[in-house]
Amino acid sequence: ARPRPASPPVGRSKVVAWALWDCGSTGLNAIVVTFVFSVYLTGTVGQGLTGGASPASLLGRALAIAGLTVAVLAPLTGVLVQAPHRRRVALAVLTGLAVLSTSATSLIRVDPEYLVAGLALLALTAACSDLASVPYNAMLRQLSTPETSGRISGLGWAAGYVGSVALLLLVYVGFIGGSGPTRGLFGVAVQDGHNVRAAMLVTAAWFALFALPLLLTAHTFAPAAEPGDRRVSLLGGYSQLWSDLRAEWQRDRNLVYFLLVSA
């Protein structure tokens, strides 16, 4: 079989659009999964929960379900999105689901009856965001050559780091910091979790804003010489993934390193 030709170099604007998606996605995960919404669920919404399981243990189960879902579906997703148009559609759908589920977390009130719904939305957001990274990472092959993949992937990683720090600062300063009945520079009421719920809307808007440039320009990326549409079984997806990783290791090890770090 012929080796796949390297993708031609692309303009800076397309690389920036690609990196901005990571800026939005990593920020969303930091707020929803790690630092703000998860703490709101276990420390506020779940207080007074009756029954044997604690809010923290229920959170662990929700994250385990999300992680298992990603572990099962990510390899198959990676094979199914090898065709560039499928890649774009999958990225748009999964990004949209992550934005919508994050927006819906603003409906979770300070009441133990809302805990299960909140955990379900958190798990859905985490799973969709992680699965969206599969077509996102695959787009790197359309943007880079073996010589530039390390630099471009590093830019994406840096954008994600900066995005998470910037959004954390925005949410803390604007909605969380301080004491009393209102919090943050915007003075949002703490009662019924309004300050955290407002921060979730800002987080959803953040991801949507930074994802938009990539979603609008992905169709202009140079199509790499990759397999077209085909039906693949779950086991076939894992087999194809292993074959692709071995082939990519021979072609461009920097890209494989980036995919492993992003996993």
What does each of the following model-derived ranges do?
Residues 2-16, 219-260:
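Juxtamembrane intracellular "pre-TM" segments in multi-pass secondary transporters
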Residues 92-113:
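C-terminal ends and interior cores of transmembrane alpha-helices
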Residues 142, 178, 211-229:
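Helix-loop junctions on the cytosolic side of multi-pass membrane transporters
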